[in-house]
């Protein structure tokens, strides 16, 4: 995904306010060299930020005709206006592993027998996960297959099938948090149990 930005020479609260009033958003690029102050078209940035891939993909940032690979690292929003106050990008080194969070996409939830027949309600405890990998291996998202999770079970971080070249960060491996749970609500009864209860008693 390509992002076009322009060099920014002025900084400070007053300069940033004037920039935003002119339809621009201030930002910075850091890492692997000198920090670079930039400005971006606010409307284009606002629409880009609505895309999931913008937050979890390697971006091609063009500044003054020169391109560099970056990751979006931070966005500051106005508390009640549709306004981006500031955006941070980090340069990416193709030979160095990066740590970042990627979204989880949950698959086959609707067809899961625990939901259809077992009365379970699948709960997403975590919707993104922190990984480490080389930039070339960075996935836009990671799929979590819920087809086989059973009623009353939980799926943990280390249960997720990761793409080649991708690993969980060390603290997630150690903590192994719950990603998804499939509890049966109190008082709920599975279709199978209900069917058993409806059978006439043997004479």
Swiss-Prot record:
Give me the disulphide-bonded residues: none
- Entry GO terms, CC: cytosolic large ribosomal subunit
CDD domains, per the entry: Ribosomal_L25_TL5_CTC
Record key words, sorted: Ribonucleoprotein, Ribosomal protein, RNA-binding, rRNA-binding
| Gene3D superfamilies linked | Ribosomal protein L25, beta domain, Ribosomal Protein L25, Chain P
Q: Name one GO biological process term.
A: translation
Q: What GO molecular functions are on record for this protein?
A: 5S rRNA binding; structural constituent of ribosome
Any Pfam family the entry gives: Ribosomal_L25p
The protein's matches in HAMAP family, at most eight in alphabetical order, are given as: Ribosomal_bL25_CTC
Q: What PANTHER family has UniProt attached to this entry?
A: RIBOSOMAL PROTEIN L25/GLN-TRNA SYNTHETASE, ANTI-CODON-BINDING DOMAIN-CONTAINING PROTEIN, RIBOSOMAL PROTEIN L25_GLN-TRNA SYNTHETASE, ANTI-CODON-BINDING DOMAIN-CONTAINING PROTEIN
The record's function comment reads: This is one of the proteins that binds to the 5S RNA in the ribosome where it forms part of the central protuberance.
**How does this polypeptide assemble, per the annotation?**
Part of the 50S ribosomal subunit; part of the 5S rRNA/L5/L18/L25 subcomplex. Contacts the 5S rRNA. Binds to the 5S rRNA independently of L5 and L18.
**Similarity section:** Belongs to the bacterial ribosomal protein bL25 family. CTC subfamily.
Q: What is this protein called?
A: Large ribosomal subunit protein bL25
Q: Which gene encodes it?
A: rplY
């Amino acid at each position: 995904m390509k992002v076009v930005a322009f060099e920014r020479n002025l900084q400070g609260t007053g300069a940033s306010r004037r920039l935003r009033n002119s339809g621009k958003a201030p930002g910075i690029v850091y890492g692997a060299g000198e920090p670079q102050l930039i400005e971006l078209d606010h409307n284009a940035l606002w629409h880009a930020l609505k895309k999931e891939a913008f937050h979890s993909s390697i971006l091609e940032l063009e500044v003054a005709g020169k391109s560099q690979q970056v990751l979006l690292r931070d966005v500051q929003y106005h508390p009640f206006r549709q306004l981006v106050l500031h955006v941070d990008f980090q340069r990416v080194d193709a030979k160095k592993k990066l740590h970042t969070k990627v979204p989880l996409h949950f698959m086959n939830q609707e067809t899961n027998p625990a939901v259809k027949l077992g009365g379970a309600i699948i709960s997403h405890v975590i919707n993104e996960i922190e990984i480490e990998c080389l930039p070339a291996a960075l996935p836009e998202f990671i799929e979590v297959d819920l087809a086989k999770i059973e009623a009353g079970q939980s799926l943990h971080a280390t249960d997720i099938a990761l793409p080649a070249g991708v690993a969980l960060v060390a603290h997630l491996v150690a903590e192994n948090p719950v990603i998804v749970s499939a509890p049966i609500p109190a008082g709920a009864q599975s279709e199978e149990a209900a069917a058993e209860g409806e059978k006439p008693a043997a004479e």
